[in-house]
């Protein structure tokens, strides 16, 4: 089933992990352009080079950009660069974030750590939504041609990276769980506000994924691998490419009537716990 992803994507956090997998997947699926944004420009450049080697569109172009999502002006510069290079933004994937490095109960939680999580995971996502929305609102509506029929599929799609912790709580990771819950609230609110403008907003909510972020979490808690094997019904963590597959579907015309939802991709982990 072709996803018909021949537009332009902006992916933050694209220097590693899920963001990198998503950027590469867009290139392989036929996107004509991908803005590969990361705080680490060298990492973004490396992803860009890799994407060029697997791109399937004959006119594909990768645009590596340094961005600090906590800085509104930096985000605006990224979006301006995207428009100057490609004229529009069809898919915006907000993957930049920080994960768990230290496990502490709530009575030992540090305000400084909470602020750091909030700045990146929540305000960083908000900054990207605000800036990209200004572009999407003014661009033309895309059309899907299928089986001899055509239908309008909107002006653009925004996909935020949440977590299965957007729905559940895990002991000793208060800042992470709190901010990932907030990402889901932001996603739902933005979906309501932007639906009249024909812009969809959703979230993907992974469990543990084989990324540097999870490696850092394991370094902070050596018991984590055994716990993962015990509580994940599929008995393994996800690969970044498995998350990217869902991201591509959720931003494609094939999901054109889906907005305001979080798609949990966790190998069945949350099936065994009560969600909110």
From Swiss-Prot:
Gene3D superfamilies: NAD(P)-binding Rossmann-like Domain. It holds the Pfam family adh_short_C2. The active site is at 176 (proton acceptor), 176 (proton donor), 180 (lowers pka of active site tyr). It is an enzyme of class 1 (oxidoreductase). Belongs to the short-chain dehydrogenases/reductases (SDR) family. Cytochrome P450 monooxygenase; part of the gene cluster that mediates the biosynthesis of annullatin D, an alkylated aromatic polyketide with a fused dihydrobenzofuran lactone ring system that exhibits potent agonistic activities toward the cannabinoid receptors. Within the pathway, anuF is involved in the formation of (2R)-annullatin F from the diastereomer of (2S,9S)-annullatin H (compound 12). This is Short-chain dehydrogenase anuF. The gene is anuF.
